[in-house]
Amino acid sequence: MTHNPYLESISNGTCAVPYDVLGVHGNDGGAESSLIRSFQPYAKSVELICEGAAPVQMTKVHANGMFEIALKTPSENQYQFKMTGFDDASWTLHDPYSFPLQLSELDQHLVAEGTNCRAFNKMGAQLMEINGVHGVHFAVWAPNAQRVSIIGEFNRWDGRHHPMQTLGGSGIWALFIPALTSGDLYKFEILDRAGELHEKTDPYGFASELRPRTASVVHDVGTYEWNDAEWIKKRETINWYEEPIAAYEVHLGSWKRKGDAGEQFLTYRELAADLIPYVKDLGYTHIELMPITEHPLDASWGYQVVGYFAPTSRFGTPDDFKYFVDQCHQAGIGVILDWVPAHFPKDSHGLGHFDGTALYEHEDPRMGEHKDWGTKIFNYGRNEVRSFLISNAVFWCDLYHID
């Protein structure tokens, strides 16, 4: 077996350009020859399965689990790997490194320029189909990282699997993972320049685990069927500078509880049933929600946000929150959110020192820390940070119909 440093950069978790190592490559055999390579540390053997051909055994070329096979002609058809584990269990997967990345140079430029107001359509975890294969395309901004991987139950939370490809000067990393679907847990594992590992929640994640767990959750934001078309059409004709507004401000976690000792939160759907008629009977026109974005600390009332694009899972799923907004609108009640672009907490899984450096925050603590709250302050001078925050405001209006 070889000890090629080129291959070892994958197994030791330092590779920033895995497409240069894994997948299909030219071979020394000439123009009519290709090499397919895969890193499978939990497999004792790997077979290559091509359409219309019998499985072919791949050769283990590195003790840490690198397999490869040379083919006489380039593999243009889709192929899969069939792995057999050390316990003789087998599983079959498409090769992530056989799929094209989905961020164009324009996409990268707009984020870097700070003018992409809907970066949530490209960044984070995007469910999609590429070449007839369903999966999730991931993208994250971490310009000072040495290596970024996607980790989850699907790869035993092992950062040697699924290293992402750095996309040059944009600082964005990307990778498509076939077969992942809505509900799958994931994080980004980031190796910084000092050699330290960081497990981070997705800044653009659409859903999150219930605290104290901190993984992001793949979620399809386009499946909910809205029934508030009448409200949406009506609000376009209203001059809110002239119309009277009476807003009922409420913290969903404390307005009303259930359980023998009031220890349980109401769900978004239960709140829709109880809160909306209560507010309507009092004559209010709007409900103003204290922050419902994902946050680790109950006592912060939501004002220390980690998941800016995820409704807190304390009260249910993202679609449950859409149901709450939908029901408000059908009852003629507008919904306003308290939004927190001023600061964020120092929790290790959050935005702070995201790639081992002051990325979303100021490096100078005199500008980057809110002493009264013990939180970080956004660096509004960075284009990518402005794109993140503006996209977040647009996200809640576009996808959750916030007023």
Language-model features: locations:
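The feature marks proteins involved in alpha-glucan
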Residues: M1-G30, V61-A142, L167-E249, S254-E263, ...
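Beta-sheet entry/capping signal
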Residues: S33, G135-H137, R147, T285-H286, ...
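Glycine-rich, histidine-containing beta strand-loop boundary motifs that form or position
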Residues: S38, C50, G152, H161, ...
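Short proline/glycine-enriched turn/loop motifs at strand-loop junctions of beta-rich domains
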Residues: F39-S45, W141-V148
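Short beta-strand elements bearing conserved aromatic residues within extracellular beta-rich modules
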Residues: V46-L48, V148-I150, Y186
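Solvent-exposed serine/threonine-rich low-complexity stretches and specific carbohydrate-binding patches
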Residues: A54-A63, R160-G168
